[in-house]
């Protein structure tokens, strides 16, 4: 089944399942881009989850290879809600546009909504700030909110440069979130800290008294 069918049947994905699929999508995109292939129509309908659990990209009808594909690819490709702002402005096809579409896709799979609302083919959308993930998914960690906000940023230079960079950030953020935080001594043993401060204060006062008397 496609991820669009999965979303329709089950609704927004649990965090653990979402992270697994996000990693698969980013690894697949990274492999495509290293081969100089731009998919140009990333969306849940074009992502198939097989019985073997493998995620596969479908529909390469709009795929573009810079320097090899005929024409310059300036025609508006793909599905409007997944198109990057620069694609609407007629920018030359680039990996950044695939990464933006992947960001919208992953946002939708997690939240059940589009970050900028649904965009119709006849619209000329204005992109401001995406709706925070936490509005739809209060259970999402703060780092995930920040990660997806960067993925679907309206300015290309604010997004991830490559699928590999995005995947690394995803893995590192999750790992850091799972690591136990070393609590400060004041939190762990407040009585010990206050006793030590009291003793230190007493010693300072005694030293000052001795200095003043000599």
What are these regions (language model features)?
Residues 27-37:
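Protein kinase catalytic-loop region centered on the HRD/HxD motif
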Residues 179-214:
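Regulatory extensions appended to serine/threonine kinase catalytic cores
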Residues 79-178:
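C-terminal lobe helix-coil module of Hanks-type protein kinase domains
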Residues 55, 68-77:
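Regulatory activation segment
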Residues 21-22:
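Activation segment signature within eukaryotic-like protein kinase domains
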Residues 2-13:
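AlphaC helix of the protein kinase catalytic domain
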Residues 46-57:
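Conserved protein kinase catalytic/activation segment
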